[in-house]
Amino acid sequence: KHYNKKANNFKEYSDMNMRYLRISGILQRKGRGMIIVPAKHILAEKLAKSTSNEEPIMVQYKRLCEGAELPTDNMDTAKALLNDLIKQMKGRQILFNINDLPLNTAAEINIARRRLENILSQTDEIQYAKEQCNQWQEIADYMELLIKGGGKRTYDDDNVIEVPKDETPAYLEWILWRASLAIDHMVNKPYEVRGFKLDSDFLPVSAAGGGKGDLYCEFNDFTILTEVTMSTSSRQEAMEGEPVRRHVSD
């Protein structure tokens, strides 16, 4: 009643907080809520147990600024996380090999775990790519939202798609990536096509960095290199045309 700021602040700040949680890789979307990523259950439990303490707030703040310890710095916890991940991957019949890696310290165990997490992530992304040919309507709906400069579309109580207005460049790259996967017949892997990072829900974290093309699609007889821009000015070709030629030559 007496709030003198924009009413949208309540929604926008909550959306940003949810996004930060997803970027952590520990939580993912489920309907309108969030759940713990199955592969990160033990880590989430350890983090939850380690956050409550009686230290003064300034002591906690100083430790965070200097680099707070993580549960995975403990060797027993690191082993438990690695063993849990191995169990999950065997249950899903995903091939892996870490026999060449030493497992004598927490740091070495975490290196092995990150290798497995990368294999698991790539496996999930390949499966996600295979599903895109059946997601053409959602892809088209995202494109319509991008044409409007962002917004939201509600299918039902548990299914809502959204393009944040300040993230349209990242979402344009992302939806063109999905459209390319839907066309299929590419010979390179889906994670080799994109130049941007994804969160655990396969949503874009940010736009692609510099130094290479936004999308790099390899087919049997040809390659398509895509540079994405939301610009509509007369300088659009100057901004994106030159980088494409340079990336092709590289």
Predicted regions and their residues:
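Non-catalytic protein-protein interaction scaffold segments in large eukaryotic complex-forming proteins
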Residues: 1-2, 19
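Short helix-coil junctions and helix-kink-helix linkers
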Residues: 2-11
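Short amphipathic alpha-helical surface micro-motifs
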Residues: 9-10, 18, 207-209
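Accessory beta->alpha helical hairpin/"wing" motif in late/C-terminal subdomains of nucleic-acid enzymes
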Residues: 14-19, 23-92, 110-117
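Catalytic core segments in nucleotide and nucleic-acid processing enzymes
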Residues: 102, 108-109, 115-250
